Amino acid sequence: LLEGAPAHRRGLVASLASAASEVGALLAVGVSAVTVASMDEASLQSWGWRIPFLVGAALAGAVWIARSRMEESPEFHRQKAAGTVPESPLRHCLGKHRAAIGRAFAISALGSITYYVGITYVPAFLTSAGALSEKASLWLSTIAAVAVIVVTPFVGALSDRIGRKPVLAALSLGNVLLPMAMFSLMASGSHERALAGAVILAALAGGVSAVGAVATAEQFPGEGRVTGLALGATGATAIFGGLTPFIAQLLVERTGAAIAPGAMIAVVGLCVLPLFISMKETAPLRPPKTRQLSG
């Protein structure tokens, strides 16, 4: 998507892919909710639980067909024509793009912890903290997911207009200052405060996801880009992704501090902020606007 997008619209196009992943998550919740609501307990336990998986399998098949018919990006065709496709992408990346791998790691680290702690973990936090019932926390998380879908394209478009660097730096600073207060709000027992905290956390995570999608890819030239992303971005997701909700819950239980998950996000935000401030801008220069002379 990014390599085939117009240079001055890469942020928006890449952010739409991030927003689409949230649409998929909402669809999963919706299919599950309809299945549960439309069946009795015995039927659900016997065979009904398979319905969401069957819907997912059908969608996966449709996506596979669509992906199999996609053409290679113009960037890859350029590399083939120029004879610059690396024979060993891994050696090429480790030899020439180690710093870029580190930057991609930092961007993805912030994106991963904001998503997995600031969105994925929130329903469990609300339920375990006793602030909301399980049903209420799931509805609240659904609203937060909608907020992500709305925010993401706007942040992607903003990064096209003012650049990736200022957007990343601002979001990093926001993730230093706000998450602890938001988790404190969500633990207050008030539905309104919990909603505000969850939506703000979701907006921060969606913003990082939006600009991170394009900023990580732009750290590398076309040659070795996918390998660089696999090493940097995917590596950070493995570290700061799946286990962080478990660690967040463990910290809450051991310390009794509701703000502990927010502190996790803040620490990562503080660590990557200096890098975001000092890194070079990767967004292409916007084409100058031409004025039409009258008369």
Q: Could you tell me what each predicted segment is?
A:
Residues 63-68, 266-295:
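Multi-pass alpha-helical transporter architecture, strongest
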Residues 173-189:
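C-terminal ends and interior cores of transmembrane alpha-helices
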Residues 222-254:
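A late C-terminal transmembrane helix in Major Facilitator Superfamily
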Residues 11-36, 231-244:
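Glycine-rich segments within core transmembrane alpha-helices of 12-TM secondary carriers
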Residues 68-89, 285-291:
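Flexible cytoplasmic inter-helical loops of multi-pass small-molecule transporters
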Residues 21-67:
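Helix-loop-helix hairpin linking two adjacent transmembrane segments in secondary transporters
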Residues 161-172:
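Cytoplasmic membrane-interface "Motif A"-like loop-to-helix N-cap segments
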